[in-house]
Regions:
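Catalytic core and acceptor-binding pocket of nucleotide-sugar-dependent glycosyltransferases
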Residues: 127-220
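Conserved donor-nucleotide/metal-binding helix-loop-beta segment in metal-dependent transferases, i.e.
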Residues: 87-121
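The conserved acidic donor/metal-binding loop of glycosyltransferases
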Residues: 81-85
């Protein structure tokens, strides 16, 4: 019998190792979209993407956001970042949330305001100050409110074939291609623009509640103590100046 629920990830480049779920859970298919032809897994169905028409980070986001284009044969989907270990049957979460909502994600662990997150992105060097300011100024002109909410966006649970979700995901992808490439900065605005609010799930990669475990990115794992110390000092100085 064909499953109607798929857990999927996207891994382009060598940013992360592919982490197998703890087991192949009943009622779930597991798919990994990747450009790495030698990638192997005991659980993930490896689907090689040959047409790389965007920078690798945007290829990841393309598959992350536009699930209706690549997984239309499934009714429900859960996207997980490649550095998240699935520790329990995610179908239980789909049954818990997608019977009530079309789109659910973990709440951001630290902030609920895109404007605050934008400042943090600049401080951490994740976005350029001029581009980020331009994006936030545009949102202010549109009267997008502060503290509208924020998802962590590393887990996305969706009924991805509904017209509403297709419209939201299409808008989100277009916004990401015209503004900064931080998807957390654009999603809240897109939800607001579509007269939708955040629906949060209790389970997250940071507070797994038995379902998820967050694994450090390769880049973070490979940094020396002095590299980490230098980064922290740089951030402290930026906080004073910014």
């Amino acid at each position: 019998m064909k499953n109607n629920f798929v857990v999927y990830t996207a891994l382009f480049g060598n940013y992360d190792d592919l982490i197998d779920p703890k087991e192949k859970y009943e009622g779930c298919d597991f798919i990994c979209f990747t450009d790495q032809i030698n990638l192997k897994s005991n659980i993930w169905d490896i689907r090689i993407v040959k047409e790389i028409d965007l920078p690798l980070n945007m290829m990841n986001r393309k598959y992350k956001i536009l699930s209706h284009l690549f997984l239309s044969e499934y009714e429900w989907s859960m996207y997980v970042d490649a550095n998240i270990l699935v520790r329990n049957n995610p179908l239980e979460l789909a049954n818990k949330y997608l019977t009530k909502y079309d789109f659910v994600m973990p709440k951001h662990f630290a902030r609920d305001c895109v404007y605050d997150e934008a400042k943090e992105c600049v401080l951490l060097g994740k976005t350029k100050q001029d581009e980020t300011k331009k994006q936030m100024d545009f949102y202010k002109k549109q009267c997008f409110p502060k503290n509208y909410g924020m998802g962590e966006n590393n887990i996305l649970l969706r009924r991805h074939n509904t017209d509403k979700i297709i419209n939201i995901m299409t808008d989100w992808w277009e916004e990401l291609n015209t503004q900064t490439k931080r998807d957390q900065l654009s999603l809240a605005y897109i939800l607001w623009k579509n007269k939708e609010t955040f629906n949060y799930m209790e389970e997250s990669a940071r507070v797994g509640l038995g379902y998820f475990e967050y694994i450090l990115h390769n880049e973070s794992k490979n940094k020396t103590f002095f590299q980490k110390l230098k980064e922290k000092m740089t951030i402290i100085i930026k906080r004073i100046i910014y």
